[in-house]
Amino acid sequence: MYEIKKIMLHQKGLCYIVLVLLLGTIWLVASDNPYNSAMEQYKSEYEWYLDKVNGYCTDESSLYLEQEAERIAEAKGKKSYLLESYYDGKISESEYKKESQEIGKVLEHQNGFEVIYQQYLYTCENAKNRYFLQTNGWTGLLGGGTLNFVLFLGILLLVTPVFCSEYSCQMDALILTSKEGRKSSLHKLLIVISGVLLMCVSISLIEYGFYSLKYGLPNGNYPIQSLSYFAGSNKSITLFEGYVYIGLLRLFGSVFLAILLMFISVLAKKYAVTLLAGAVSVIIPYVGLSKTIIYRLPLPLPFLLGTDFFAGDIVSRDAFTGDEKIVFAEIHTITLLILFSVSVFLCILAAALILRSNSNKWQMKTRKMRNVPTLAIILSFVLTMTGCSDNGKSQNFIPASNEPSSRACADIWRMPR
């Protein structure tokens, strides 16, 4: 209870958590832009067609869209011809208005059709795992793979003072002589991890609620390949499963970063060094390395990003030569499991070293010294028994002048014990 009060109140941990959630929400609302602006701009027209073809691309929906494309193309051509005829005086104004009304009915949902037709062309490339759906909500929630700087800064502010505050006022010397030093460090670890998890889960739920209200998150059981960002993915997961898995990876990445910061603070024992090392371990790879390299490093950063663990190969094409270049190579499941296992091992090792560095040194030495007297007593007992056994065997060699004494000694050894 004391450690909770110390971290959350005296070190302003609770204030940082609330501030992160508040700023994170404000930043989310202010910076969000729809991935497909036309889908939002012509939402009603798009939904009119989506209701007819929603879900798996069947032969019927494909035929319907192709026929609709021909019908709209003919209407556009007829509209242009009608306008020219009117200006040339070939038709009257009444005839022009009458024909224009009929053409207008065909072109009523034209803008929405262009959006659905582009989605249709994407779906046809691999109809088995690409479905028709509103993509802006899910793309905003899953796509992008960018670092949440608000959460990152919140973790830095929450974790850094936990041990550095004790080193700054030289409380570490007192803790090392206390019986509760190791227990106190364990409580700090658990409290910090709980606070970090609270921030991550809250931000994840806020994002889900925001995109659900603004765009909608329908059809969570559709394949993740329905989003163009995951077009080349070989992972057989749904949209909602992708949200859960990415969220779990980000949770682990946040915990990994928190443990790394505490480990650095125990080694460096200074605020500035801990903050700088924590920032460098995330910012430098994020800015200076390609995603292909980042997602293969046992660092917190790839897990904080999370998204591209489920993306396929991303290829860019040169506009002049037509040559293709792989910008990002897909992370296979085995690679992900190996990277995760190594990272978990590093977390456990760092946590163990943190606990050991804050354990009572005198008690650790005393435990080793307690074994010395025990071994000495056992050794003395063994030597005594060995010595007595030798005396019993040497009776036959005692001179005759000492015969009474030897008999007395023999009688003593024959007595029941």
Question: Model-predicted segments: where are they?
Answer:
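Internal alpha-helical transmembrane segments
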Residues: 1-34, 183
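Alpha-helical transmembrane segments of multi-pass membrane transporters/translocases
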Residues: 12-23, 27-28, 253-261, 316-367, ...
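Central hydrophobic cores of alpha-helical transmembrane segments
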Residues: 17-20, 272-285, 303-304
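Secretory targeting signals
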Residues: 23-56, 100, 108, 112-166, ...
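Long, solvent-exposed extracytoplasmic domains/loops
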Residues: 52-128
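Short helix-to-coil transition segments within interhelical loops
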Residues: 176-182
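C-terminal motif of bacterial Sec signal peptides marking the signal peptidase cleavage site
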Residues: 385-387
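Short, low-complexity, disordered segments immediately C-terminal to signal peptides
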Residues: 390-403
